[in-house]
């Protein structure tokens, strides 16, 4: 049986390595991997600026944990924060039309927020304060935490999400410094 060229599952792992890719020499580090994570503080950072269809988009790094220096967020907690924050942001009267995306970082040390427009970190401190207070004070059913609505609806931890959100508000957002607003 011939192997399909598009199906990694049927190929040996050794068939696909970065060394064997013809574009290897052209690959550069992506901007987020050039940030010194050994010095990065919890805070709100402009990750970069993107142009999409003639419009500027500002991706923010909402850093809730100091990378490699404190435990990462628990999967259930960050998943619940994702659901609650995304719901809050898309319902915020002032910002909902600018929200493109809210979601967790793969490293589980924070989230990404993509907003339309040329924005600075300081511009969204109040929005983040309100968002995380909403999460910290939330009671009831988690929006979208049902089999029909979510790909992993059982992976939620509301008490831990509330605890992490409160900690972020009290220790970061309520006393944020300039060092926590720029890489």
Language model segments and positions:
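Active-site-adjacent, His/Asp/Glu-enriched structural segments that form or flank metal-binding
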Residues: 103-174
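Low-complexity, highly charged intrinsically disordered N-terminal segments
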Residues: 172-183
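M16/MPP (pitrilysin/insulinase) zinc-metallopeptidase core fold and M16-derived inactive scaffolds
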Residues: 67, 71-123
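His/Glu-rich zincin catalytic helix
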Residues: 20-77, 81-89
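Cysteine-centered motifs
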Residues: 6-11
């Amino acid at each position: 049986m011939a192997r399909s060229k598009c199906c990694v599952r049927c190929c040996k792992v050794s068939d696909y390595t970065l060394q064997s890719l013809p574009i290897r020499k052209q690959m550069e580090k992506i901007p987020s991997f050039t940030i010194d994570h050994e010095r990065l503080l919890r805070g709100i950072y402009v990750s970069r600026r993107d142009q999409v269809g003639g419009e500027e988009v500002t991706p923010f790094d909402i850093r809730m944990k100091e990378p490699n220096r404190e435990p990462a967020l628990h999967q259930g907690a960050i998943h619940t924060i994702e659901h609650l924050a995304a719901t809050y942001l898309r319902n915020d009267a002032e910002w909902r039309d600018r929200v493109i995306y809210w979601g967790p970082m793969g490293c589980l040390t924070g989230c990404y927020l993509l907003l339309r427009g040329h924005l600075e970190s300081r511009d969204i401190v109040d929005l983040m304060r309100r968002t995380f207070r909403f999460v910290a004070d939330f009671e009831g059913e988690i929006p979208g935490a049902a089999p029909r609505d979510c790909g992993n609806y059982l992976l939620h931890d509301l008490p831990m999400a509330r605890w992490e959100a409160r900690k972020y508000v009290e220790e970061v957002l309520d006393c944020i410094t300039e060092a926590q607003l720029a890489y």
